[in-house]
């Protein structure tokens, strides 16, 4: 866990203020911290964000210490979301039992598939906890997440990152209209892979700045 300088924190809050002013009060607004902050700074930010009526503050703390999440949640009116880095329903069980957050974010790939995602959602339903599936791994994961979400009574929304250059791995792209995906109706996941383009996506190691200390990458 890391912290920003006071100046960086003030800039962050001002950025959120300007976005809220631009979109108005009726648009859902979320802030994602990628687990960067220590507890004191996460608490300060969550409390300062209260005036902006966020839908949630995503992963303000690293995922390992659930008691820290309990302390954070008790200290703020800003809803908290987390769970994208968990890989099993047993981790989500503890997360839910401790009431660490307001929304959980299981990923169909990281948790072992759409059936496991569905089981996690069923468990969350008993805690009246909405599910916001994490989804940053391309159109195949999106298709799996759509099917799982279709049978989740407590599904809220699906994370979706449009990356046009990755859509060509499908013969027919998924249909997105007015912010909603149409459920594919073909067998299986309802998609067909375009194997001709696989050579364009050979794995290449790379570094992501998602978990780099905030001081090193901020602005």
PLM regions: where:
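Metal-dependent enolase-superfamily TIM-barrel catalytic cores that perform enediolate-based chemistry
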Residues: 1-76
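Catalytic cores of large soluble enzymes that bind and process phosphate-bearing ligands
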Residues: 4-11, 112, 137, 189
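Structural signal for hydrophobic packing residues in well-ordered secondary-structure cores
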Residues: 20-23, 53, 149-153, 202-205
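Shared catalytic-loop signature of beta/alpha-barrel
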Residues: 47, 53-56, 64-187
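Extended hydrophobic packing segments that form well-structured cores
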Residues: 189-219
């Amino acid at each position: 866990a890391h912290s920003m300088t006071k100046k960086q924190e003030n800039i962050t809050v001002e950025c959120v203020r300007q976005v809220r002013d631009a979109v108005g009060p009726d648009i859902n607004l979320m802030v994602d911290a990628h687990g960067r902050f220590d507890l004191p700074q996460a608490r300060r930010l969550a409390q300062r964000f209260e005036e902006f009526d966020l839908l949630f503050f995503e992963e303000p703390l690293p995922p390992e210490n659930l008691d820290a999440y309990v302390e954070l949640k008790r200290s703020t009116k800003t809803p908290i979301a987390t769970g994208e880095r968990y890989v099993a329903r047993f981790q989500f069980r503890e997360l839910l039992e401790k009431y660490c957050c307001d929304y959980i974010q299981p990923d169909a790939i990281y948790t072992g598939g759409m059936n496991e995602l569905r089981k996690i959602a069923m468990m969350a339903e008993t805690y009246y906890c909405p599910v916001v599936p994490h989804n940053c791994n391309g159109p195949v994961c999106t298709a799996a997440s759509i099917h799982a979400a279709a049978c989740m009574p407590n599904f809220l929304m699906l994370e979706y990152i449009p990356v046009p250059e990755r859509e060509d791995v499908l013969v027919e792209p998924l249909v997105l209209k007015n912010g909603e995906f149409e459920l594919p109706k073909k067998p299986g996941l309802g998609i067909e892979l375009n194997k001709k383009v696989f050579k364009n996506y050979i794995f290449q190691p790379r570094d992501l700045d998602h978990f780099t200390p905030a001081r090193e990458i901020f602005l």
